[in-house]
């Protein structure tokens, strides 16, 4: 049956209801970032997933500008000839003057056009450009900081390209240049210094100083007003980088951040209040069947179980059907990503499960790339033993089946004592002997280069989670990105996430947080914090996040010990859920995916571009932001199946398929009633109504969006236009609509 999704977020609060699409015929958008076709971090995901939505809006007038890397071009880019004579003349002019500029199509969804600048080929001009940067912006870059030097080269090449492109056009187009992060920020500063007619936007996905300060175990968010930013940046030897970032934020026509929590941070550290908050989204896959993602979960979980069977050979004394898989993934920042809190909570969870005699087992995965030199021999041996046991079992099964077939064929019952011969028993005994081992299953799947000082391994030694038989919580540290070609765990990241039961991301510093967002889109419950952009976004858009499988951990107003206790409580309550309750919760989690779709969140970027055009070209574009009436906002209400707690929810159909559910005695009660997921989804869609947006009538007043000044404007002014305050989804939310 087709999956009908809620239209609850077809219009987000604080953004104008555009009735007329913006006409980009004489406007060109360049999106500049170091991670264009060059995977380094999360910005790559932002650009990759947003490309289709932006391309649909701008068409062939949308270009991405990034650095040329041989690996990236070979695997991700199809080199092409420039499609317009102006662009071809621009590239030819730059190449004739000693630069190397490439043009092509990024082979991702949407297929955006890309301009790639070879920074290495322009190193001959580095010292001259660094001198010009000092004369123009008073920013000095030390010779030893290669990343900052690359940023200088990339910035000057970007400015050169934009200036040359404008010069080659007889009819000057309206150019919007959107720069992401400090590595691209030098180009923005130079565009303004050279007075290029370009509307500029700067988006910071995380502040440099914020990341360094949070890693230093300081009470960051409660002391934002007290930091001496110049002193702190200087002590960490990143003052020149900080100056690049701050200069870009102040030079931009429009300054944006990815979350409200980062907006507060940027206001204090970069000394400019963001004009608008642009949350990160994802491309949401629409499932054709109601329970398709549940089937994918079961298939992926089976792949993980195969790995667990091999990893814990000889100590597989727990029931895999009563085993939950938790995971944390991301950049290896032990404190910033909350790995310290997660480990402490796992130790406490292990104690609770043991003293309460729980039959539930938890396997916690840490997917964080670290320095290794090879696979752990014991881990490889475990997978080899598992495969050998499987081959042995298949051999015995074939011989048994053949003898049984021959016996039945002649019309006699087989003699079970003769079905297996001595050779078969010897083979099976050898297989059993191969599973014997004296040591505990390894905690780490690889050999670490810094085993004695590694933060995760050091903490595991302190809390004593060694994967012993008595432990109900097992820990597996996989210090490498997941790959479907791995000899250990041959699954890619998406398949691994689908197979797990819970993602745990108790980050202290997380400007947005793509990992919990990806969990939500895949229908996997997750734990986030009120210090992450994703956690704040969901907390402010959902009346009861935990009912939808979004657990928000308080790390801002609680001590570290209290946060650990709260996380332990979340984990323990999740372990107490039955399979039926987890199915219901996953259904609810997956229904939130529309809230994270670029189809809706892309409108924040649209609003930022309109604002930049109005500021850069005030004679041709107008933009009048209006305050938002709180009554126009909305929040996802509690699920229609009241009460919202999964522990009290009714059965998920079909009831007979829940073989793990405990038998119940007595007459049917409320908890034993049939739970119809399709019916509950329909109730949610009725309850989660889109707000009624006022229609705009024609008038001579200017609109709240950026339009040509000679276009017919509308009135009365919509109360849903972008406010002057930093636009977060939180700033205009009303109460829950019933």
What are these regions (language model features)?
Residues 1-738:
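Catalytic cores of nucleotide-sugar-dependent glycosyltransferases that transfer UDP/GDP/TDP-activated
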């Amino acid at each position: 049956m087709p999956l009908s999704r809620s239209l609850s977020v077809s219009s987000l609060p604080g953004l104008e209801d555009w009735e007329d699409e913006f006409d980009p015929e004489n406007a060109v958008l360049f999106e500049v970032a170091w991670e264009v076709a060059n995977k380094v971090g999360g910005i790559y995901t932002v650009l990759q997933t947003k490309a289709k939505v932006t391309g649909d809006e701008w068409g062939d007038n949308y270009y991405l500008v990034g650095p040329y890397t041989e690996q990236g071009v070979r695997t991700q880019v199809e080199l092409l000839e420039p499609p317009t004579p102006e662009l071809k003349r621009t590239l030819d002019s730059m190449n004739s003057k000693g630069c190397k500029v490439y043009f092509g199509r990024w082979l991702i969804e949407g297929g955006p056009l890309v301009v790639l600048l070879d920074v290495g080929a322009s190193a001959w001009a580095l010292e001259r450009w660094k001198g010009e940067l000092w004369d123009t912006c008073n920013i000095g870059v030390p010779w030893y900081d290669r990343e900052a030097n690359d940023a200088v080269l990339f910035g000057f090449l970007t400015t050169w390209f934009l200036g040359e492109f404008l010069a080659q056009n007889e009819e000057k187009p309206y150019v919007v240049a959107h720069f992401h992060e400090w590595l691209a920020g030098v180009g923005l500063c130079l565009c303004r210094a050279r007075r290029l007619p370009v509307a500029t936007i700067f988006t910071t996905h995380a502040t440099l100083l914020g990341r360094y300060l949070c890693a230093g175990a300081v009470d960051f968010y409660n002391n934002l007003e007290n930091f001496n930013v110049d002193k702190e940046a200087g002590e960490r030897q990143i003052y020149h980088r900080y100056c690049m970032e701050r200069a870009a934020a102040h030079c931009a026509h429009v300054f944006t951040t990815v979350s409200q929590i980062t907006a507060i941070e940027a206001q204090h550290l970069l000394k400019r209040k963001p004009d608008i908050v642009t949350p990160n989204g994802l491309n949401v896959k629409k499932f054709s069947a109601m329970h398709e993602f549940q089937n994918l979960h079961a298939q992926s979980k089976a792949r993980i179980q195969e790995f667990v069977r091999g990893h814990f050979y000889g100590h597989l004394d727990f029931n895999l059907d009563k085993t939950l898989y938790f995971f944390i993934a991301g950049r290896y920042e032990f404190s910033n990503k909350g790995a310290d809190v997660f480990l402490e909570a796992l130790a406490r969870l292990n104690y609770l499960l043991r003293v309460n005699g729980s039959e539930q087992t938890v396997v916690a995965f840490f997917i964080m790339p670290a320095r290794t030199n090879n696979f752990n021999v014991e881990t490889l041996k475990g997978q080899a033993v598992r495969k050998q046991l499987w081959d042995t079992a298949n051999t015995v099964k074939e011989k048994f089946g053949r003898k049984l077939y021959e016996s039945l064929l002649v019309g006699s019952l087989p003699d079970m004592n003769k079905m297996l011969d001595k050779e078969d028993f010897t083979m099976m005994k050898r297989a059993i002997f191969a599973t014997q081992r004296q040591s505990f299953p390894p905690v780490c799947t690889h050999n670490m280069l810094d085993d004695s000082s590694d933060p995760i391994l050091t903490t595991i030694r302190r809390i004593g989670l060694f994967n012993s038989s008595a432990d109900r919580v097992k820990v597996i540290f996989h210090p490498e990105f997941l790959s479907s070609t791995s000899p250990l765990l041959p699954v890619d990241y998406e398949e691994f996430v689908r197979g797990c039961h819970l993602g745990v991301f108790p980050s202290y510093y997380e400007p947005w947080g793509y990992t919990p967002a990806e969990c939500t889109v895949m229908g996997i419950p997750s734990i986030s914090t009120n210090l992450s952009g994703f956690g704040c976004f969901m907390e402010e858009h959902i009346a009861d996040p935990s009912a939808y499988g979004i657990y928000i951990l308080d790390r801002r107003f609680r001590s570290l010990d209290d946060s650990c206790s709260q996380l332990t409580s979340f984990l323990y309550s999740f372990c107490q859920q039955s399979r039926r309750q987890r199915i219901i919760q996953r259904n609810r989690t997956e229904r939130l995916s529309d809230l994270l779709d670029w189809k809706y969140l892309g409108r924040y970027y649209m609003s930022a571009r309109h604002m930049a055009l109005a500021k850069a070209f005030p004679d041709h574009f107008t933009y009048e932001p209006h305050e938002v009436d709180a009554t126009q906002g909305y929040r996802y209400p509690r699920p229609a199946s009241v009460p919202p707690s999964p522990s009290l929810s009714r059965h998920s159909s079909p009831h007979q398929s829940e073989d793990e559910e405990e038998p119940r005695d007595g007459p049917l009660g409320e908890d034993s009633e049939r739970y119809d997921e399709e019916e509950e989804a329909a109730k949610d869609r009725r309850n989660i109504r889109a707000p009624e947006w006022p229609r705009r009538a024609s008038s001579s007043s200017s609109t709240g969006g950026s339009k040509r000044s000679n276009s017919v404007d509308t009135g009365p002014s919509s109360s849903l236009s972008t406010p002057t305050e930093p636009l977060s989804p939180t700033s205009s939310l009303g109460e829950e609509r019933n």
